Every structure is written in C-alpha cells, then in structure tokens.
Amino acid sequence: MTENWRDLIHRAFSGQLALRHVWAITQHHRIQASPGYRAAAQYVTDQLTGAGLSPVTHAYPAAPDVRFGSAYSFLEWECEAATLHRLDAGGEPTELLCDFAAVPISVIQRSISVEGDFPVVVLGGTGGKSAADYEGVDVKGKVVLTGEPLARVAEQAITHRGAAGILFDGIQAGNRVNFDLPDALRYTSFWWPGPKAPDGFGFVINQRTGQALRSQLAGGADVRVRARVESRFYRGSLDVVEAFIPGTEEEQEILLVAHLCHPLPSAHDNASGAAALLTVMTMLASLIDSGKLPRPRRGIRAIWVPEFSG
C-alpha cells in the first residue's frame, strides 16, 4: 500500500507547477520586512487558499523598540527609486552606474533618502575597516569606495566620521577570485537594529567598474557621483505564512519550513524551496480532499518565513 501511495504522489506532483511558482515568487524583491516580501507572501497565501487550505499570516513587529530574545527587530524599508550617475568635469551626469528599478541589488538595501553630488574617495590600509585607514583622510560628506565588510566600514566612515555613503564593489571570498565574476553584484544591506537611527546610503557596483574607478583615483582623477535615493523607513511587520493539514493524531505534527525572503530574483535561494513546499502542500491537500490519499497520522504544518527574523 505504501508503494501505491508513493507512486500516486509522484504522479500528482507537478514540476511544471513548481517552476511556475518559482517564476511568480522571483518577480518580487522580497527582502525581510518590505512590500516585496509581503507581495510574495500574499501570492503563497492565495495559492494555498485556492487549493482549499486555510492559511494564516502571522505578523511580527518590524520596529526598533522590539526584541526577539536577544535580537533587536528593525524598521520596515521601502525604496521607490534610486540611481547613481558618474559626473563629468563640468558636473553633468554621464554614465549611469546604478539603477534600483533595473537591478534592485545595485542599491545597498535600507539606504536613507538622499539627493546630491558627492566626491568619491578610496582608502588604503584595510580599505576602511580600521581607524588607522582614516589618518590624514577627510571623508566627511564623501562617498567611500570599498570592497570590505560593509558593517565595519559604515561604522568607521559614516557613523564616526560623517561620510555620506558607501560605494561597494566587494565579492564574497571563497573559491572565487575577483576575475571569476567581474560583472557580478553582491547583495548588500545596511542593518540598523534597535535604537540606532539609519544614517547612510550606498550603492553596489561590479568589480570591473570598481577597479576602473580605483585606477582613476590612484592617478589623481577627481571622481564625483550624483546620488538619488527615494526611500522610507516605518514600523511594519515580519510576516510568516502558515498552512496546516490536520492528521488523525492531534498531538503529533511534521513541520516543513522554507524561507521566502531574499532579493530579486534569488531563484535558488530560496524561491525554489518556497515553491517546492507550496506545490507539496497544495498537492497533498488535493489528494486528501479527493479521497485518493488517506489523512496522515501526523499533522503537516508548513511555514514560509523571512530568514533569520520574524
């Protein structure tokens, strides 16, 4: 009998439907506590409801005065538009370096609103991670070009020394080297946990562009950019979608989890997991409701969560 159930499930599971769910989810820029994440969560909810399930959305506060255990929550963030242009010697915009509308991760997530022209500086030493890198260098009101860990550079440059923002061209170390992915952008975000007020903006460029700017700065060129970010922070929510298939033994359950968040498109991390779980739950509900599959002994509970939070 178990073999028959297995065959039934194999026939009923649709890889094409799972792929369609991946396509739908990846249309949303779904970082934690954002309108894009909420839109993806609504899509999951609608699909579960259409399959006869009764999903519930649990909303946990995205606010700086809230803590989950020892971890502070954070404000929700929405970005309407953001661009970064290179300026010529006359102060006119020439090359478009970054555009949130085209590539959302070309903006450092959770940037504050800004509009203005800024000189770009690059630091020696550890690239802005340590206080010694700033000796004899005035970064106040300037944009710091760096590929080093964002949190440490932002603290040193923006918080302690009044830099306006960060221009980031780093790539995650590991088996890759810079030349393997010269045109890749690394997903990067400020985190303003707890009572710390957001105080900076930033953009992300690829290694190729970053190296060109570094070479020009090293040669004495005056590199200036025009930055525009339209964003807002507000008390929002971290949403968790839950669906449940009851079992015949009320005290026992199987818990299935997928994280729904991450920047657009992030198909493998983790739209694929969220879509697979969605397809499994709707398939099982259909088979059980039609009588083709008996109700399981243990309940099956699925949750779609924002990773590391909520």
Where are these regions (language model features)?
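Generic start-of-chain signal for non-secretory N-termini
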Residues: M1-R20
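Metal-dependent peptidase/peptidase-like ectodomains
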Residues: R6, F13, L97, G202-F203, ...
